[in-house]
Amino acid sequence: MIMGVQAQGITQERYSLIPRVLVFPVDEKGQVLLLKGASNKKIWANLWNGPGGHLEAGESIVAGAKRELLEETGLSAGKLIHCGQIVVDTGINPGIIFFVFKAKELSGVVRSSVEGELSWFSQPQALKLKLVEDLYTLLPLVMRHRANEKPFWGHYSYDENDQLVMRFSR
């Protein structure tokens, strides 16, 4: 049976997801490299987050994670560990799905970009920063994730007061 685009049943009415990647570079001392969003950014200005962004058309998830890491930090990863994926139900179509990675065996020279400034932190230090809201929960999950473990599944939604609701499972 032919599985062309028309056979997929894809229409504007169907719920769709925008793919993104989020990468947490971790050095040999166990410190994580975070990015403080530039003050002129539309979203997450002056908040700390992992490097990441949208996939380009035709780009694989892994290629997108490697590209975003290099563009935003100047680093390449010898080892990219898939920690999980999270669907974000924004209440409108499309939603978001982001794929979360831990980057290890790093090479290159750390350099800030137009996205913001970079700095290394221990996990306890990082959790005291002004982080993007979900990182207080997400960062510990990523930091304790091991390469041989199953990735986690996450679902984010917003309640009637526009407050973030997070659920995770394995």
Segment roles from a protein language model:
Residues 2-9, 83:
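Short Pro/Gly-enriched beta-strand edge/turn motifs at strand-loop
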Residues 7-33:
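Conserved N-terminal beta-strand and adjoining loop/helix that marks the start
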Residues 11, 83-90:
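Short, solvent-exposed loop/turn elements at beta->coil junctions and helix N-caps
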Residues 42-46, 97:
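A conserved beta-turn-beta hairpin within the catalytic core of GNAT-like acetyltransferases
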Residues 55-78, 88-142, 164-170:
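Unchanged
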Residues 75-84, 152:
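A short coil-to-beta-strand element that immediately follows conserved catalytic motifs
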Residues 144-170:
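Charged phosphate-binding loop/patch that engages nucleotide di/tri-phosphates or the phosphate backbone
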